[in-house]
Amino acid sequence: MWFKFIGICRNAFAANMTLMIHNENDEIILISISGHDKPGVTSALTGILGTFDCTILDIGQSDIHHRLSLGILFKTTNSLSGEIMKELFFKATEMGVNINYTPIAIDDYRQWVSMQGKNRYIITILGREITAKQISAISGIVAQQGLNIDDIKRLTGRIPIVHEGNTPQRSCIEFSVRGNPIDKEAMQTEFMRLSNELGFDVSLQEDNMYRRCRRLICFDMDSTLIQTECIDELAIRAGVGDEVKAITASAMRGEIDFKESFTKRVALLKGLDESVMKEIADTLPITEGVDRLMRALKRTGYKIAILSGGFTYFGNVLKNKYGIDYVYANELEIDDNGKLTGRYVGEIVDGRRKAELLSLLAQVENVNIAQTIAVGDGANDLPMLKAAGLGIAFRAKPKVKETARQSISTIGIDGVLYFLGFKDSFMAE
C-alpha cells in the first residue's frame, strides 16, 4: 500500500511539473557553465535569472580539481530569453567562465519529467584504488542493462599521488542510476564476477527511503570484528589446535552442521583453565577499520549488536570497548575449579538463531527489518545476511561471497560506511 502511495505521488508530481510548461510563449533553456571555480559564480548567474523572474526547473554543480561544472535548466518567455542570454554572457565573461546555451523542446522536457517515476539504484565501488578499467566495466554493464547514470561522486577524500601515513588507503565511487534493468539478477552476478576479476568491491542497492534511514546493525564477531577465531585460540592453548581448526574451517565453509561441529570443538576444550580466556582477550587482533566504523555508527545513533557463534566472554570485551548495545553468543560452562567442562550453557547461536535474533532486535528497537544491516563472513551468517535489509559478506568464504548480495574484501570493515552513503568528509579520523 505504501509503495502504491509513493507511485501516486510521483505521478502527481510529474503531472504538476508538466502543467507548469503550458504557455506557447514559454521557453526552456539549459545553460552549462565551466571554468575555474571561484566563490560567487552561482550567486551571480542565478541573480540574473532572478531579476527576470525565471523558474529554476533543475540545477546541478560539481567541482573537480578547481574546475567548475554547473548546469541550470530554467523557464522563461520568448520575449525575455534574448535579454537574459545577453546578461548571462556578459556576467560569465566578467567572471572568467565559459557558458553555453541549449534550448529544450517542450515535448523533450515533458518526456524527461515523466522518467522520474522509474526505479533508482545506487552502485558503490570501492577498493584500495579505483581504476579506469573498473569504472569502464561497471558502466558498461549499466548501459547493457538499459540504465542511465544520473550522478557520479567520490565518497572518499582526495587521493594523494604518493600515499603516506598510517591510515590505510581506500577509494570509493558512488553511481546513482535510473531505470528498470533488463535482468537484475544477471547484472548482480556480472558485478560480482568483475569484482573478483578486477580486484574491487561492488554494491547494488535500491535507492529507497530505507537505505537512508537504517537504524540497527548486527555483526558476526570472529573473523569479522576480530581477525581470529576465538575457539581456535582456546584450542591451541589446550593442545588440540590442529584438530579444532580443521573442524572450524569445515563448518565455516558450510560442509558440516554448525551445531554438530560446535559441540565437538567445545568438548575438546575440557580441562582448560578459564584464565586463558583473559589472556586471549587482552591481545585480540582487531580488524582494520573497526575503530572508525564504531565511532561513526555511535555518532549517528545506530544500535549495534554482536550475534556470534563464538563466545560471550570475548563479545563482552568488545561491548565494553566500543559501547556495543547487545551481545548474543555462546556461554562456556566452567566448573567450581575454574576449568572448562567441555560443555556449553543454553542454546547454541547458530545461523538460524542469528536470523531470529536479528528479527527480535528489530522488534525491540521498533525498526522495520528493511532498516537493518548484517555483516559476517561464514556460512552460519548467511541466514541473517539474507534476512537483513542490507546483508554484507566481509572477507567471506567463497560460498558466502557467492550467495551474499553485497561483499567487502579489498579494504577494512569501515567500508560498510560507504555502502550506507557516508562520505569521508562526514567522519573525523
Where do the model's predicted regions map?
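Cationic, low-complexity basic patches in intrinsically disordered or flexible, solvent-exposed regions
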Residues: 5
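Short glycine/serine/threonine-rich phosphate/pyrophosphate-binding segments
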Residues: 41, 134, 225-228, 312, ...
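Active-site neighborhood of HAD-like aspartate-dependent phosphohydrolases
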Residues: 209-259
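Long, charged amphipathic helices and adjacent flexible linkers at domain junctions
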Residues: 105-117, 206-215, 248-274, 330
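C-terminal cap/substrate-recognition subdomain and adjoining C-terminal extension
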Residues: 271-429
